[in-house]
């Protein structure tokens, strides 16, 4: 008999369906995991074994085979621990397979059986909702999952603190309380543009850039107030709508930076250092993660000392500014992240992915031809600050 449990694989901001298949058959005792697992997934054998031992369960002295299907899709991350454990428990007859058929399971297991958070739960909840299934996830991320899978659509969310509580709930001896969607964080108060004295021309340009979602080039001598004005931009942008907040939170969830499942209505503000690499700015790495331009989705990306960025890094901005997407190509996958610059006030055609103004600071002749090529991709407000306007700041 083969037991089946549904889970997901993350490819950028896309969740692919994965089926965890478990077979317990006579033969030489062993625990075999196949289906292109990475090192983190391969180590789940030890975590699952230790978690079951903490529950007082022992693996049967048989040949255990776990297959992550489809086998040609790379599997990365520790969120496979929980579905692997549930599939194994189903094959051992501890839990009824029919009770797991309508759920997607994600979560990492601690050695004592606790279900601990893993990145991407919000994306898994979206996938579960689209496939009309419930979601089994860590208790610490239940409020995060409830933004999508709970509430009016009736899709259940089982937020389990540990494996024992989850099994007791499935057996009917314990009831896991449905999690409530986490309250949206209040918009934090940053620098107030009204408190900046002088620089009326600069402040007017800032307002125009915010209203029209224009890129803005700020050039001037040190101490002119360019960085201060740039930090004031999020304060004059409107709050994120519920749909926009969900989009921003999905990116944060995949990156593992969403705190306590709380959806934020504040516009993201990212200010990478000029030594940032291409992978840091556009996304990449061994396990592809969103870069700074995607983390600024629907928000502000402030590039201070722009000419000090490496030429190759600046060149990597051309396509995102033109197409509104960042595609990271790897040998085993092509991952696309959002990087759209678009007016939230509907001046232009509304697209799915938006990002408010990109700031360029301290422009000069270094890499000039390349910089102007980048800037000409979109309407740009070019502002030259004069120190004479700084009196009283």
What do the PLM-derived regions correspond to, one by one?
Residues 1-228, 310, 322, 327-330:
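Peripheral, non-AAA+ core regions of ATP-driven protein-machinery
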Residues 174-208, 212, 243-294:
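P-loop NTPase nucleotide-binding/switch module
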Residues 218-257:
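Walker A/P-loop
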Residues 220, 283, 305:
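The Walker A (P-loop) glycine that initiates the GxxxxGKT/S ATP-binding motif of P-loop NTPases
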Residues 269-272, 289-298, 329-346:
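AAA+/SF3 P-loop NTPase mechanochemical coupling elements
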Residues 287, 315-337, 355, 365:
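Substrate-gripping "pore-loop 1 plus following alpha2 helix"
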Residues 290-321:
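Conserved AAA+/SF3 P-loop NTPase catalytic/coupling segment centered on the Walker-B
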Residues 345-393:
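N-terminal low-complexity segments that are often proline-rich with Ser/Thr-Pro
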